[in-house]
Amino acid sequence: MQDRHVGRRPLGPRRPWQLRLLLALACAAAFVSPIEATRAADYPSRPVRLFVPYGAGGVGDLTMRLLARKLSEQVKQQFVIENRPGAGGILAMTEVLRAGADGYALGEVGNGQAISASLFNKLPFDVLRDFTPVSVAAFFEMLLAVPGNSPFRSLKDIVEAAKRSPGKLNLGAINPGSTQNLSAHLFQQVTGADFALVTYRTTPELLTAMLRGEIDLAFDYYAGLISEIDSGKMRILATSGEERNPLLKDVPTAKDAGFPQYVVVGWNGIAAPAATAPDVVKVLNAEINRALAAPDLQEQARRLGLDARGTTPQEMRDRLSADIAKWRGVIEKAGIPKQ
């Protein structure tokens, strides 16, 4: 039976121009690969800008400064922190995209951006589509604290009191739309307790209000509260993590205290524009994980209540996706209007 070639001419001898074209393509392929390899091998060959969507001194800023310092030592190029606070991280991440996808502009991404994805009506970017995750840098939990002279000795005590007298106890947190604020909403949702939620602009304002006796329970991170806790002016009823904090071994988690659905783990990591070369992302991931494993960085992070621990890019993407879904549910259930 005769072979038939539908829509295709039988193969025949190569014409000279075809041979020249194939040779040119082969040379081009051989030429591109070393350039890409060299770019990854030489990266970084100049300072790297790391955009942080928070002001100086907060947990997000402190995490990135620890990491940037160690990365600068390792690769012999400066990782320069550029703080761009405001607008739920929009300003910082827009700067990253504007700077280009060459690996020399990176952004801090974490639970804050997961919240922004559901809190804002329209963002100038999609954090999952327009960025490629590199690695998580640190995890951190919330502390649920009361004044040092509070009559409440356990989380169960204060929840039961809030149920007996709805709206009578004040629950303090910072910034509407912040992880702390939404964690307070989630706490009421999973416990059924009815607190009056009082919002403050900054952690120092929150602390001042608590020390004045204006609020009965506060939600914030370890780094923000620990000095007042060490002085005895505040007392921790529980932490929000999966496991007990090694610095606070006598303090139960909310799960231990009888509220297994209340788990909040904040985190911050690094992302690059989506078009960044995979080899550059691979180099960054390896260097970040090496930096985070350094004993001196581990000790510095531990003193700030941070669990400094790297991940793969896919693990960071999975966590970001899960947190977007989690906080969207909290926002919708709380009836928080989109901005």
Where are the regions that the model predicts?
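Bacterial N-terminal signal peptides
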Residues: R20-S33
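Hinge/capping helix and adjacent helix->loop/strand transition within the periplasmic-binding protein
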Residues: R98-Y104, S118-E205, A254, W267-Q300
